[in-house]
Amino acid sequence: MKNVIAAVLATTALTSPVLAEGITEFRIGILGGENAQDRLNSYECLRAYTEEALGVETKLFAPADYNGVIQGLLGGSIDMAWLGASGYAKTFLSDPEAVEPVLVKINLDGSYGYHSIGFARKDSGIDSIDAMQGKVFGFGDPNSTSGYLIPSIEIPTYKEGITMESGEYFDEVKFTGGHEQTIVAVNNGDIDGGVTWADGQGEWEDGFNSGALRKAVDAGLIDMNDLVEIWRSAPIPEGPVVLRTALPTDVKAKMTALIDGMYEQDKDCTYAISAGESLGFDPITHDAYLSIIEARKLKSK
């Protein structure tokens, strides 16, 4: 690990880590979607790199839900996080000056989009949204882009008569709490179908190249051959890595450079923090999320 850290720092012109100006610790928030310990394990490599790069104690925080990370960023108790697009939209709408989007995960084909994937158990006989009529449908977290915002808007346009209210088209519509919870609930037969996120690239059997299904496969939670895709959203812009705007300029520059250069120096760490295979992270700006911000505004009316 020490050798890899040195290589990353050299690549990003951080060859002499010193106490970062104006801070005594750095706090990284990790969105929900899988159990807290797995999230902490996935981000441990980034925590170690950050501590070496900034020269201050670095802590990981894995709140129970998306809102815990969002409120941490807004309140100044979290300095950096990889948000979903909807989570970024909520943060921006709450306080436009709270955070800066700096980087985005890049797929193996060079794109930075992903999909909300609807899925069910193969042995249920459910193979489409049509077959979900009268069944139990699961969302993840209310602040998830792919686990709630986009499917709640797009699925009702699939055909006339679909709503996302319990007792109408679906027998029940419920929130499971996160992506992993939705996947496990469908796999166990606790709900009939649900939605999660994936880049939509690669093989179904692998859980695609990256996303919550890939993480679940890697963790041994599911066999994708037991599941079937029943719906797919239009492409969604991948959420941004954000930094708290009030951080010192040198800290923001070091952290942006560190993550931007991670793929070249430590592909295993990149795999861990990006939920599967990717080409690492590239710069992104606020303008990439204008459509999601508008969708979030409309949903709140």
PLM region spans:
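Sec/Tat signal peptide C-region and signal peptidase I cleavage site
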Residues: 15-20
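Extracytoplasmic small-molecule ligand-binding "clamshell" domains
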Residues: 21-89
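An extracytoplasmic/periplasmic, membrane-proximal ligand-sensing/linker region
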Residues: 23-30, 34-45, 51, 243-301
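Periplasmic-binding protein-like
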Residues: 24-31, 101-117, 211-247, 253, ...
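Beta->alpha turn/N-cap motifs
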Residues: 62-66, 77-95, 104-105, 179, ...
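Hydrophobic residues within well-ordered alpha-helices
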Residues: 73-74, 132, 186-187
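A conserved helix-loop-strand patch within extracytoplasmic ligand-binding domains
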Residues: 104-163
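Pocket-lining segment of extracytoplasmic ligand-binding domains
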Residues: 142-248
